């Protein structure tokens, strides 16, 4: 499927609205995420590789906050356990509709892929079934901080022994100099990918009230308190990282 280039913030806006995952964003999302998140393609593909090491027969693999289904597609490319099913969940109607279109296109190109169910739902209200792999790929940061512990606890309870949670997030840093350096480098990354100063500033204004990053130590402590036994960072590029949490 084709997608449009991200020009959502290219023109001056009289009032910058809070960022929402609507049809406008869904239409440009592949371009937006690739140009905004350093290492994103590597993270997505390796979630599939990692999942293949943890997926178990007769369980479900969850992609929570699936957006257009990039992680779901990676899971289906790499996992071949018997009687596994991918459950892809997002609360955005626009994202879910396009996700289904992308997965239909994937089905037409490959044979014997894992079955997938795409749900338009709030992951905070989702009833988890027995799972061997859960992916939260840049999703937790959009959930209210006070609601994050309960969600992680419910995910931990749903994971079978030998399963795993993969958590990818933008990070904040306790050290002010480290925070400033990595913020500046991230802005440089976006400039190098063709975003103007206006686009960078307006996108930052739109997203700062809806995305609340945590530090790596906050993530680690929260996961341990939720019942996970081990937290292993496996990827970091600038201020973006991905962790494996083991039950």
Swiss-Prot record:
Coiled coil: none annotated. InterPro entries: CmoA (IPR005271), Methyltransf_25 (IPR041698), SAM-dependent_MTases_sf (IPR029063). Signal peptide: none annotated. It is an enzyme of class 2 (transferase). S-adenosyl-L-methionine binds at residues 40, 65-67, 90-91, 122-123, 137, 204. It comes from the Bacteria. One of its GO terms (biological process) is tRNA wobble uridine modification. Homodimer. Catalyzes the conversion of S-adenosyl-L-methionine (SAM) to carboxy-S-adenosyl-L-methionine (Cx-SAM). This is Carboxy-S-adenosyl-L-methionine synthase. The lineage of its organism: Bacteria, Pseudomonadati, Pseudomonadota, Gammaproteobacteria, Pseudomonadales.
